[in-house]
Design a protein with these regions (language model features):
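Single conserved hydrophobic/aromatic residue that forms the stacking wall/gate
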Residues: 1-9, 13
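Conserved beta-hairpin
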Residues: 51-63
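Conserved acetyl-CoA-binding loop-helix of GNAT-fold acetyltransferases
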Residues: 83-96, 114-118
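Conserved GNAT acetyl-CoA-binding A-motif
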Residues: 96-108
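Conserved acetyl-CoA-binding loop of GNAT-fold acetyltransferases
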Residues: 117-126
Length: 143
């Protein structure tokens, strides 16, 4: 059976929050403290607008992604499990099974930009501000 499962946020919400925090603290070092706290507070709202899929290893949720209308809206891997191919498995599943063709990435998150380029995404547009109007430039990428 696949380690990728559709999951309602409420079932594993606490664990998703832990994963988000672990991932963001280790990949988004450009975030101001108050913005980190703002996004953390907004997570429940973001979760309501996506279909969530989790990746389990030995029964433990170690990563998840959120999909909406062909867009990969979020992909977070617990920092202890990064670099072993889980993100690639999730995004491959999304492309092959969920018709995902687009992703928006923080330009300052070099690891993520490199990851998506490696998968085959290319930047087609850039925004100076993120979706919340904050000064974190976004690269709009597509396959």
């Amino acid at each position: 059976s696949t380690p990728i499962k559709s999951s309602a946020a409420s079932d594993v919400y606490k664990r998703q929050m832990e994963i988000w925090e672990s991932a963001v603290l280790n990949t988004h070092d450009f975030l101001k403290e108050e913005d980190f706290l703002y996004y953390k507070e907004q997570l429940p709202v973001y979760f309501q607008h996506v279909t969530l899929f989790g990746f389990e290893q030995e029964g433990i949720l170690v990563g998840f992604m959120g999909i909406a209308k062909g867009n990969l809206e979020m992909l977070f891997i617990d920092n202890n499990y990064r670099g072993i191919g889980i993100g690639k498995k999730l995004i491959t599943y999304a492309i092959d099974n969920l018709q995902v063709t687009k992703v928006d990435v923080n330009e300052q998150n070099n690891q993520a930009v490199g990851f998506y380029k490696h998968i085959g995404f290319n930047t087609y547009k850039r925004s100076d501000l993120d979706g919340e109007g904050k000064e974190y430039p976004i690269l709009h990428m597509r396959l």
